[in-house]
Amino acid sequence: MKEKSVKLQRTESLLKEVIPEALSTLSDTRLNSLGVVEVDCSKGKYHAEVYLDAPFATPEEKREILRQLRLAEGTIRDHCLSATGWFKCPRFHFNFDDSTDKANRLDAIFEQLKKERES
């Protein structure tokens, strides 16, 4: 895997800060509480994969949240443009990050193995 340029890393870092601000300005309370885990921009910065964390949302709620985010993408992009002073903003593609769920399941398995070894 190639290393990302410093400029691309800076863009991703800035988006990781600005997107939660943009989400907090929306009227939908489900979107206000979302956490941004990671932002991964394409090389040309035309697209950005935004990985979100909503630990207590059911799969149905997650589908609805993604639908609402697609509808609010223009507002989020406008906020990012005004907050950063950029002339263009990448198109956002929202996904839920399930790595924390996987890590929690692995921790539970390791804890169970530890208890079995002790007994």
UniProtKB/Swiss-Prot annotation:
InterPro entries: KH_dom-like_a/b (IPR015946), RbfA (IPR000238), RbfA_dom_sf (IPR023799), Ribosome-bd_factorA_CS (IPR020053). GO terms for cellular component: cytoplasm. PROSITE patterns: RBFA. Keywords: Cytoplasm, Ribosome biogenesis. It comes from the Bacteria. One of several proteins that assist in the late maturation steps of the functional core of the 30S ribosomal subunit. Associates with free 30S ribosomal subunits (but not with 30S subunits that are part of 70S ribosomes or polysomes). Required for efficient processing of 16S rRNA. May interact with the 5'-terminal helix region of 16S rRNA. Monomer. Binds 30S ribosomal subunits, but not 50S ribosomal subunits or 70S ribosomes. This is Ribosome-binding factor A. It comes from Wolinella succinogenes (strain ATCC 29543 / DSM 1740 / CCUG 13145 / JCM 31913 / LMG 7466 / NCTC 11488 / FDC 602W) (Vibrio succinogenes). The lineage of its organism: Bacteria, Pseudomonadati, Campylobacterota, Epsilonproteobacteria, Campylobacterales.
